[in-house]
């Protein structure tokens, strides 16, 4: 879906929609986007949820609702999805794939082509590269069902026909940004890592304008 129109905003103020804006990483994405001078809209479930998202325009609605998504997308250039869901060892998880499927349909309807979507280390072909504790303890006990939905989410994005980037952070922490990170698609010899939410947010926002990782799924880590 990449064409000249997908670059029209490269030299102008980017108008982005952030999903998952009330999560720990989502809040950093919003604040950093505002600091960059972006026009930021957020889709949140209530006005109360939008508190603290300074400089962003709140739109009330559910990320799985087609009508709310189309309203939120109107006039936007790009979408950043930082949607997450709690660890769920027992119940089935469908929120990420359901919301992403609805998002893709709404983006096509509103002719918004750029999607930067955060999933995580362990999704898709990064499975088995989380290190011993993550792969052998955390993943099977807490995250198996969440990652089954992340895998489906990634497949929906890959098959969307949009100008997408899938971002797979390693284990997240709240430490200050280091500035320098590694973005990997060849995971040979890689087994585990960590990265700050601050650095993840910066990398994700860079993908709104940059085509370097278009149609790729980099794992990002320190």
Where are these regions (language model features)?
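Glycine/proline-rich active-site loop of Rossmann-fold NAD(P)-dependent oxidoreductases
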Residues: 125, 176-181, 207-216
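Conserved Rossmann-fold NAD(P)-dependent oxidoreductase catalytic core, especially the SDR/UDP-sugar
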Residues: 39-41, 45-47, 90-91, 101-145, ...
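Substrate-positioning beta->alpha
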Residues: 95-96, 167, 195-205, 216
């Amino acid at each position: 879906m990449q064409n000249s129109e997908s670059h029209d905003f490269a030299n102008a103020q980017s108008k982005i929609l952030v999903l998952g804006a009330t999560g720990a990483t989502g809040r950093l994405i919003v604040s950093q986007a505002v600091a960059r001078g972006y026009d930021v809209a957020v889709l949140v479930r209530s006005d109360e949820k939008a508190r603290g998202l300074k400089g962003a325009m709140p739109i009330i609605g559910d990320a799985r609702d087609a009508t709310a998504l189309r309203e939120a997308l109107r006039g936007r250039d790009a979408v950043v999805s930082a949607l997450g869901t709690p660890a769920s060892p027992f119940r089935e998880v469908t929120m990420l794939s359901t919301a992403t499927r609805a998002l893709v349909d709404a983006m096509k309807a509103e002719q918004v082509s750029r999607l930067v979507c955060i999933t995580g280390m362990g999704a898709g072909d990064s499975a088995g590269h989380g290190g011993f504790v993550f792969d052998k303890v955390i993943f099977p006990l807490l995250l198996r069902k969440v990652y089954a939905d992340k895998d489906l989410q990634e497949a929906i994005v890959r098959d969307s026909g949009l100008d997408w980037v899938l971002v797979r952070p390693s284990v997240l922490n709240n430490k200050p940004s280091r500035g320098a990170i590694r973005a990997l698609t060849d995971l040979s010899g890689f087994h585990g890592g960590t990265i700050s939410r601050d650095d993840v947010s910066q990398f994700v926002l860079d993908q709104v304008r940059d085509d370097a990782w278009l149609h790729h799924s980099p794992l990002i880590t320190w």
